[in-house]
Amino acid sequence: MGVLEKIGKKGVGEITLYTISDCKYCQTLKGTLQELRIPFTNIDVEQNEAVGDYLESKLETEYYPIICIKKAPEEYTYIISETNLEKLNRIRIFNSIEEALEILLEYYYEIQV
């Protein structure tokens, strides 16, 4: 299914940020998305430990923010800062907040075009 065929599918392109309160990168990312008027849902994993535990187990990382973009129904891309799952194409790695934003915007605008 091509990108254009995905548009209009329920929830495609939705962005969810999984953050923790004392993470400066989390705050920067949220602020930048707000400035760019890109809609997103923020989930503070300190307020929902079950979600944090699930993500840390699934993605084998304890680094935040974790960005999740819904690419299609039941298909997600996770963008995280560090992981041993680099071989999976649904995982993108970033080394700086700028790189995370670049990857995020690439996915976001690909879905919205």
Language model feature labels by segment:
Residues 2-41:
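Local sequence-structure signature of Cys/Sec-based thiol-disulfide redox active-site neighborhoods
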Residues 19, 38, 45, 51-52, ...:
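A generic structural signal for ordered secondary structure
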Residues 21, 44, 97:
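Residues at the C-termini of beta-strands that transition into short coil/loop
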Residues 71-113:
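Non-catalytic, surface beta->alpha helical segment in thiol-disulfide oxidoreductase systems
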Residues 28-32, 39, 57-58, 83-88, ...:
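Non-catalytic interaction surface on structured domains
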Residues 40-43, 92:
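Pocket-edge positions in alpha/beta enzyme catalytic cores
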Residues 44-63, 68-73, 100, 104-107, ...:
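Thioredoxin-like thiol-disulfide oxidoreductase module
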